[in-house]
Amino acid sequence: MSDAAKPIDPGALPTPTKFLIFAVMAFGQFMALIDIQIVAASLNSVQAGLSAGPDEISWVQTGYLMAELVMIPFAAFLAQALSTRWLFALSAGLFTISSALCGMAWDINSMILFRVLQGFTGGAMVPTVFATGFAMFSGPQRAMIPAILGMVSVLAPTLGPTVGGWLTEAIGWRSIFYINIVPGALVTLLAINVIKVDRPKLSMLKTIDYSHLAAMAVLLGGLEYVLEEGPRRQWFEDDGIAIAAWVTLVALGLFIERSLRSGGPIVKLSPFRKPTFAFACLFNLVIGFGLYSSTYLIPIFLGRVRGYDSLEIGTTVVVTGIAQILSTVIAARLSTRVDARITVSIGLTLFAAALWLTSHMTSEWGFMALLGPQALRGFAIMLCIVPSVTLALGGFEAAELRYASGLFNLMRNLGGAIGIAVVNTWLGDNARIHVARFGEALGEAGRSGTDALGTLAARIAERTPDAAQAALVMQGELARVVGREALTLAFNDVFRIMAVLFLAALVMAPFCKPPPLAGAAPPPPDAH
């Protein structure tokens, strides 16, 4: 093709142009990421508005996440075939259209269909901006890329519940989709006009290995389905989950076989030949586990134990976002001066410390009690994300960088999916254990326990003269208190286990080989 004879060097673009391109793409990424959390915070209102059942409404999120997970690794291939410009513009445009369609959904089936389209198109924007940023910038400027994109990645799940709750209460649930229209249209127009960093290779579309594509779709879609629906359906006790798991396992085998033997693979696994990239992906898996799980657990605690509404929850968790913003600059500065292995080790240790502090919650914890642990967690996560991105993507060039970016981002999403599924299971199991222990403790409490129950019964009897009704009220009050305290202890158990997981991840740091520091003296000519 004539286009191929005149390749574009993204690194040679004028600096203002590079920053404009990066800003447009980063905003598109933020729009796609925050949408997940905005909708998650408003699912109850969407369910009521569409008259959907509990099992049906879960597919509004599951469908989106399944489609997004499939697109993330596929984006590298499409970026080469269509060019970064047209892939990003098409993704932003279709994401905007599907958002509008979600807002106009007339029943749960139409909503699920439009959410799948929204997830598929949104998934292309996330890895594309990482690869483009690393291709355009070098030196100290490149060091800012993982910091800024890391901040975007963690701010979205932090701010999403606040924005979603406010929009739903102030305007209505359909507004959470309509809000994407204006910024989405703007990103689409800007993408068409400014993102000119490479040229399309349309001939690649003729080389698509459809069996490889199908295997990847079944593998990632099936895995997301099992992880999302498993906790609700008692995992493999449910026939549907068991069948999906077997199908996913078969798809994994076919995916690996086609990745290694196909002449036109959709996803290239060659980046894993570099041990540092493989370990950085494992870091990202753990980071995704901790980031999304902790962001999921704190609002659940505040809602179920403290009885907070959406606005109160948002006000409490926003502390984490503020700490993330403040730590972004520090993380970026460290990336040019400190070995990435040291920085990520500090980040993992601080994150583990924050989780350990959170594991001492009582049922009375609110904004002030959570302030310190949340601020520390927000500060620490940036010290985890920035060096892990540097370790993963710092040693790749050109096309391979796209595949590495897709695989790396996929790991964080998988970590989040695995994390939420696992902590849901841990939470339910541990809560039941603590309820049983409370029952045993009450039975063994002796006179002091009997006196306490007698005092409670007397207070209830004063308000409820009918003896039978008073007994029912007392049983309900006792069950509520026991359930609340058992759930609080279960939350603490989960945070404690997560803290140990982050400390265990430290063993991988010595096996990584960091790229040269961006702020270091220029390397000798033969350094590469």
Question: At which residue positions do the language-model features occur?
Answer:
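Helix-loop-helix hairpins in multi-pass membrane proteins, especially solute transporters
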Residues: 74-216, 229, 238
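C-terminal membrane-cytosol helix-exit motif in multi-pass small-molecule transporters
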Residues: 181-199, 218-229, 247-261, 506-513
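Small-residue-rich alpha-helical segments with characteristic i,i+4
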Residues: 156-159, 294, 370-454
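Central mid-sequence intracellular linker of multi-pass
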Residues: 181-223, 234-235, 240, 267-273, ...
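Short, Lys/Arg-rich, polar N-terminal cytosolic tail immediately upstream
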Residues: 1-13
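Transmembrane core module of solute transporters
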Residues: 16-80, 99, 109-111, 127, ...
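Short helix-capping/hinge motifs at transmembrane helix termini and TM-loop junctions
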Residues: 106, 138, 194-198, 231-232, ...
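Hydrophobic transmembrane architecture of multi-pass small-molecule transporters
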Residues: 11, 413-514, 519-528
